[in-house]
């Protein structure tokens, strides 16, 4: 089992790579985790009783502060389990003050198009790195993969003829993820140039490309596409995948399966994105709305006659 200090460093590196966390954000996570460790002992080995004592220690803090500290720990333990550094997750012992969840950051359709147009222009050179980058973003936005899932994909996860990937997500749970025709073409182009005996689809000298490198490549692509690099990250492209699918009419349960969420409540945060469309849909399609519109039309005609 990893020592807490090393595990914290790995966790912070993941936040920077997958979520584009700024230096101040990373410093806040570090303070929360190290503060919790001072109260509960070694976080990497801490059990539920030790974590339950944190609730008492935080009793004088504002609910928002408690929620932030508890969230940092839940994410930390989720990361440890995800990376195989720990088998159990003791974070259920942490307090859960009632707080509204922040809305996920995303990109507009036009911003995604600009990002892809730039990547496609660069891939036309048939040079390996631009072709690889196009394949990466096709899978991020086209299949909604987590950064960790994407960079660690084995070659065996990509069947030649079936339009699906076999992805191992959080907790070692496998799921089937559909791959678009565009993504398959990009993958085929990359496989033709890959030139490696590595078992990984996106190999590096040691194993596979890292989340940090994927994060850097997306930032660099955003700059070349004349987009704000602060708005672009693997995490944001995954959110864009979910947001745009929901806008297009995808069922929330289907979206839950595609994203690999264990709990539908995690997926429900995306329902905010389509509120305007849903209101318009009810106003236009609901039988009573149509009836009310008919009455308004009749009243308008009577006023005209008068």
Swiss-Prot record:
Cysteines paired by S-S bonds: none
Active site residues according to the UniProt entry: 146, 170, 235, 238, 261, 270 (o-(3'-phospho-dna)-tyrosine intermediate)
Ranges for domain Tyr recombinase: 102-283
Localization (cell): Cytoplasm
Gene3D superfamilies on file: 1.10.150.130, Intergrase catalytic core
Ranges where the Core-binding (CB) domain occurs: 2-81
Any Pfam family: Phage_integrase
Main location: cytoplasm
Gene Ontology annotations of biological process type: cell division; chromosome segregation; DNA transposition
Description of how the protein assembles with itself and partners: Forms a cyclic heterotetrameric complex composed of two molecules of XerC and two molecules of XerD.
This protein's name: Tyrosine recombinase XerC
Organism: Erythrobacter litoralis (strain HTCC2594)
Gene name, Swiss-Prot/TrEMBL: xerC
């Amino acid at each position: 089992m990893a020592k807490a200090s090393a595990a914290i460093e790995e966790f912070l590196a993941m936040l920077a790579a997958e979520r584009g966390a700024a230096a101040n954000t990373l410093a806040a996570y570090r303070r929360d985790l190290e503060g919790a460790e001072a109260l509960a002992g070694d976080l990497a080995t801490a059990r539920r009783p030790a974590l339950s004592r944190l609730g008492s220690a935080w009793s004088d803090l504002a609910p928002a502060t408690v929620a932030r500290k508890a969230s940092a720990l839940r994410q930390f333990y989720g990361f440890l389990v995800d990376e195989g550094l720990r088998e159990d997750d003791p974070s259920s012992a942490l307090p859960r003050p009632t707080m509204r969840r922040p809305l996920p950051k995303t990109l507009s359709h036009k911003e995604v198009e600009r990002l892809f147009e730039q990547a496609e222009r660069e891939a036309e050179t048939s040079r390996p790195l631009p072709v690889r980058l196009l394949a990466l973003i096709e899978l991020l936005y086209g299949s909604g993969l987590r950064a960790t899932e994407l960079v660690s994909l084995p070659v065996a996860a990509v069947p030649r003829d079936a339009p699906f990937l076999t992805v191992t997500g959080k907790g070692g749970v496998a799921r089937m993820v559909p791959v678009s025709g565009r993504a398959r073409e990009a993958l085929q182009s990359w496989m033709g140039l890959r030139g490696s005996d590595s078992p990984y689809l996106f190999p590096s000298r040691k194993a596979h490309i890292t989340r940090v490198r994927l994060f850097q490549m997306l930032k660099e692509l955003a700059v070349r596409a004349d987009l704000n690099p602060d708005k672009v990250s693997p995490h944001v492209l995954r959110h864009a995948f979910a947001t745009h699918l929901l806008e297009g009419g995808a069922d929330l349960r289907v979206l839950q399966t595609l994203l690999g969420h264990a709990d539908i409540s995690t997926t429900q945060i995306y329902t905010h994105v389509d509120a305007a469309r849903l209101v318009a849909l009810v106003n236009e399609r609901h039988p009573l709305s149509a009836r009310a519109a008919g009455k308004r039309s009749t009243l308008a005609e009577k006023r005209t006659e008068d």
